[in-house]
From Swiss-Prot:
Catalytic residues identified in the record: 73 (proton acceptor)
Subcellular location(s) per record: Cytoplasm
InterPro entries reported for this sequence: ATP-NAD_kinase_N (IPR017438), ATP-NAD_kinase_PpnK-typ_C (IPR017437), NAD/diacylglycerol_kinase_sf (IPR016064), NADK (IPR002504)
Main subcellular location of this protein, as a coarse class: cytoplasm
UniProt cofactor(s): a divalent metal cation
Residue numbers binding NAD(+): 73-74, 147-148, 158, 175, 177, 188-193, 247
Species in which this protein is naturally found: Escherichia coli O1:K1 / APEC
Catalytic activity: NAD(+) + ATP = ADP + NADP(+) + H(+)
Keyword list, A-Z: ATP-binding, Cytoplasm, Kinase, NAD, NADP, Nucleotide-binding, Transferase
A GO CC term assigned to this protein in UniProt: cytoplasm
Protein name stated in the entry: NAD kinase
Purpose: Involved in the regulation of the intracellular balance of NAD and NADP, and is a key enzyme in the biosynthesis of NADP. Catalyzes specifically the phosphorylation on 2'-hydroxyl of the adenosine moiety of NAD to yield NADP.
Lineage: Bacteria, Pseudomonadati, Pseudomonadota, Gammaproteobacteria, Enterobacterales
Similarity section: Belongs to the NAD kinase family.
Amino acid sequence: MNNHFKCIGIVGHPRHPTALTTHEMLYRWLCTKGYEVIVEQQIAHELQLKNVKTGTLAEIGQQADLAVVVGGDGNMLGAARTLARYDIKVIGINRGNLGFLTDLDPDNAQQQLADVLEGHYISEKRFLLEAQVCQQDCQKRISTAINEVVLHPGKVAHMIEFEVYIDEIFAFSQRSDGLIISTPTGSTAYSLSAGGPILTPSLDAITLVPMFPHTLSARPLVINSSSTIRLRFSHRRNDLEISCDSQIALPIQEGEDVLIRRCDYHLNLIHPKDYSYFNTLSTKLGWSKKLF
């Protein structure tokens, strides 16, 4: 064992037996290396582990130096929204489909993780968004997002009329199916599918991407991440929602606005030493290979 990490948390909700096997392999391997290991409670229950230290995501965030998330990007997003509140590094083993946020190859995870545990890694901070549903600036509901905050109809698809204010200055009004407000991390997710730009993770920027706008002049907009975005609605309806990372939904009631701003805390994401953002883009998006 080394001095870089002493206590390691294992998190991620497995959706199939193969992923659960990775959790068990990781737990037993870390124990043989002499690390203190905290296993998320649900995982320990499903593995039927005996005499193991377990904890919630918050407890892992408070006690561990490193959290290893086993799963796909959805697992990473769900865990990271909580873990980002604490001084803990996070890395992922990809057991999902695309895996933009989960770098480690499950077939070679032990060797890659061994190098990381020896201190051979790249660290970066990814900012989150905070979404508030408020009435007369009185906060009523709040959540955070690592990828994006999305304005959309609750149940039945229909056009929404709304106004967008940036730092309390009117920017534009829009008739569309919704609006995607994305971080650089989320620029390769839902925002990309809607025609938004790809932002490198280190950019202090937020993108606003319209969803099926009812005008050809509506285009994605990139603003400084220090800006505050306010959404106001022309026709008060009770079926609008704000969703965070497609995992948490906040209903919007009549007379309420939505405020979106950068969070005060960051996700401390780490990667193997040979990590390259542009290589990841090329691999995941199927870009053409180098010509010469």
